[in-house]
A protein has these predicted regions:
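Middle-to-C-terminal accessory/interaction subdomains
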Residues: 21, 197, 201-238, 242, ...
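Structural recognition of the beta-strand scaffold that forms the well-ordered cores
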Residues: 82-84, 99-102, 132, 141-145, ...
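A conserved helix-loop-beta module that forms one wall/lid of the active-site cleft
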Residues: 103-138
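Surface-exposed patches in mature extracellular/periplasmic domains of secreted proteins
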Residues: 123-134, 216-220, 247, 324, ...
């Protein structure tokens, strides 16, 4: 492939002679003293990308040598860099923090495949971009840019900002005799101290109590994501990525649980006959250095008492070893990975021997994966018979407790009220399960927090079902069915360690709503729906303090949403798939429809009166509005970039009706390059600078 043409980007590093000499001195010192923490030097990058003709010139960066193996520091031309972009609105392929390294250091395309499959499974993975790398005009060969751990990583993958945690390798990386450290610790201590404290408290509790017979894995970890993570590691033999010193831990402030962030899987480090299955029937099964260093960490998950986790792990492993999943891998190899491999083959690349460069050239053999599937299938057959015997011991299934709440009321505390028309919930926490109520009035005392779990149904059959009073309601997992229900004067209440922004929150649940009204709420959102699958027939929000309806991730299908008087947006989406019939807003202080962060929007009719901004598609979102009707609107439509690590946005409006002639009113349509707006099948061409749009929308941006 030496003479093949490849459309991978070129990255040009410019560093002055003084700083280059400093880099080389630091590299040599790091080579001889691995515990040495090097300093940054200033430099700049320029990017030329055939897929994106716009050149990014002179992006200011700071960089230093990085790595924990000698292969990172062997010489100046092949050394690995840790790179941070200087400046708030500059990004390199959507990254603000990254590494630039030789492909062998990142396990060639095996690591890219690993992270792609993680992301396809809803697990946080890193972007890895192959590049042609130049330093001061000299071509140094093929390198890869790998994303680092930042809030941008989380937002791009539909997560709210939360602490990312790793192991302090300077002390120990053997669980539980280790110390954790948080990325950007100063930020968390100054901005969101409760998230920092709760995540660290949970990790310390795990270290102290993991051998206790009452220890509950489900209280601390998002076990479904961890089950998929370990099963995928089994498939690709990425066992290095299972080590506590490799995998990064994300504390999700929406769920209060820890999720994995894949890192450093490193295919090829042995383990042909091992799988995590072996630990289920034999906790002392020998599996080399992983079991030597991570025995307690792995047994934390693969203890047979963790019935739900093991069942989920086995189900995912069966899925990953199926013919259907093999076809998915083949398709991904053909679509992306094979081209990357051909790019790597275009220059001589020595095989990866972990600690050194092998004498043979690198070659990607996909048959290794398919042979691995066959081997795992045999192990699955054995363990299912073994696990069935274990299940006969009636090991109780465990449910997640919300660890942030120690004292609470339960169903037993309202059982005497259930026959009454009026139910009173006093100040404090109420964790209620599987309620099926009809024609009730539920009064929330000031400071009451109602957390619903399981399957809940509230129906106004002969009259309106009412929730009223200054308390907060949250459906946490499970399912909620609301029909003919009115929420009055509910409010958001802060719970330390959690990011629940609504007066009414729905998290990771199935939602059915018909004829629901929320009136006079207090808080950032009247209703915040996160990571859920929602079907709404009619939802009306009156007099919302800030956002009326906030959809973070997940799917929403609605017939009618109406907002009357909102202090901020009517419908605000982030990373959501939305299909709607009719959206109406009146007296909206900000945006009628705010669609951001890779949302995918299709709405038949959007209508508004006295709206500050009409519809906005930003930060990688794709939005289609069939009919837009606005009266007394400052801005009709806009497409721009608020968060520069997202891609381009587009907004298509099939038909627009307005008391303003948008074709002659350039200030009514706001568009920045390279985003797009199409109205009545005509592409809008009046571009203005993105920063000018931000000034109009966000004071002080």
């Amino acid at each position: 492939n030496k003479f093949g043409k490849f459309d991978f980007p070129s990255v040009y590093l410019e560093v002055n002679l003084k700083n280059l000499k400093n880099l080389d001195l630091i590299r040599k010192r790091k080579f001889n003293h691995n515990d040495f923490d090097p300093e940054y030097v200033n430099a700049s990058l320029k990017i030329s990308d055939p897929k994106n003709p716009k050149e990014y010139k002179n992006i200011k960066v700071k960089l230093k040598p990085k790595g924990d193996r000698e292969i990172h520091f062997m010489n100046l031309d092949s050394m690995s860099y840790k790179v941070d972009v200087r400046g708030k609105k500059n990004f390199v392929f959507g990254m603000e923090e990254m590494s630039i390294q030789k492909p062998i250091v990142r396990n060639y395309s095996w690591e890219i495949l690993f992270h792609d499959l993680l992301k396809a499974e809803g697990i946080i993975g890193l972007d890895i971009v192959p590049i042609k790398f130049y330093r001061n005009g000299e071509y140094l060969g093929i390198f890869v840019i790998e994303e680092s751990f930042s809030k941008e990583l989380l937002e791009k993958q539909n997560r709210k900002e939360g602490p990312i945690i790793t192991v302090n390798n300077n002390i120990s990386h053997i669980f539980p005799n280790l110390n954790f450290k948080t990325y950007s610790e100063r930020y968390w201590l100054s901005k969101k101290k409760d998230f920092f404290e709760k995540s660290n408290q949970n990790l310390e509790n795990i270290k102290v109590n993991f051998e206790d017979k009452n220890f509950n894995l489900f209280d601390y970890f998002d076990t479904e994501k961890w089950a998929r993570y370990f099963a995928l590691i089994d498939l690709l033999k990425m066992y290095h990525g299972s080590s506590i010193k490799s995998v990064k831990l994300y504390y999700n402030p929406t769920t209060g649980l820890i999720e994995p962030i894949g890192y450093d899987g490193h295919f090829g480090s042995g383990y042909n006959d091992f799988a995590f299955i072996d630990l289920i029937h034999d906790p002392d099964f020998y599996c080399g250095w992983i079991c030597t260093h991570d025995k307690n960490w792995l047994n934390l998950f693969f203890d047979p008492r963790n019935k739900d986790f093991i069942e989920s792990y086995l189900l995912n492993l069966k899925r990953f070893t199926s013919k259907k999943y093999q076809k998915n891998i083949e398709n991904h190899l053909n679509k992306k990975i094979n081209n990357i491999n051909n790019f790597f083959y275009s220059e001589y690349q020595g095989s990866d021997r972990v600690w050194f460069i092998g004498p043979l050239p690198y070659y990607f053999d996909e048959n290794v994966i398919y042979e691995r599937q066959k081997k795992l299938l045999k192990k699955i057959e054995f363990i299912e018979n073994y696990f069935e015997k274990i299940n006969q011991k009636n090991i109780a299934k465990k449910k997640q407790k919300i660890l942030l709440i120690n004292t609470f009321n339960s169903n037993e505390d309202i059982i005497n009220q259930l026959a009454n028309e009026n139910i009173y919930l006093s100040k404090g926490y109420w964790i209620l399960n599987n309620l099926k109520l009809i024609d009730k009035n539920i009064f929330l005392e000031e400071g009451s927090v109602v957390i619903l779990q399981g399957e809940n149904s509230f129906v106004g059959k002969n009259k309106v079902f009412k929730f009223s009073g200054p308390g907060m309601i949250t459906q946490f997992n499970g399912e909620i069915n609301l029909s003919n229900v009115k929420f009055s004067k509910i409010k958001n209440i802060k719970i330390n360690g959690l990011n629940w922004s609504g007066a009414f929150n729905i998290i990771n649940a199935k939602v059915i709503m018909n004829n629901v009204e929320i009136i006079d709420n207090s808080g950032e959102d009247a209703i915040n729906i996160v990571g859920s699958k929602s079907n709404i027939d009619q939802l009306v929000v009156n007099n919302s303090f800030k956002d009326a309806v906030d959809i973070d991730f997940g799917e929403l299908s609605f017939n009618k949403i109406i907002c009357n008087t909102s202090g901020n947006d009517c419908l605000d989406t982030s990373g959501a798939f939305v299909s709607g019939g009719y959206l109406f807003g009146e007296n909206i202080k900000d945006k009628l429809g705010s669609f951001g962060e890779n949302s995918n929007i299709k709405i038949k009719e959007v209508s508004g009166k006295k709206v500050n901004f009409g519809v906005v598609s930003k930060d990688g979102s794709k939005s289609l509005i069939e009919n837009l009707t606005l009266k007394n609107s400052k801005i009709l439509a806009a497409s721009y970039k608020k968060k520069h690590f997202f891609g381009n946005s587009n907004l298509k409006i099939s038909k627009i009706n307005s008391d303003e002639n948008y074709q002659n009113a350039k200030d009514k349509i706001l568009l920045s390059k390279p985003n797009s707006i199409i109205i009545n099948n005509i592409e809008f061409k009046n571009f203005i600078k993105n920063k000018k749009i931000l000034k109009k929308f966000y004071v002080g941006s």
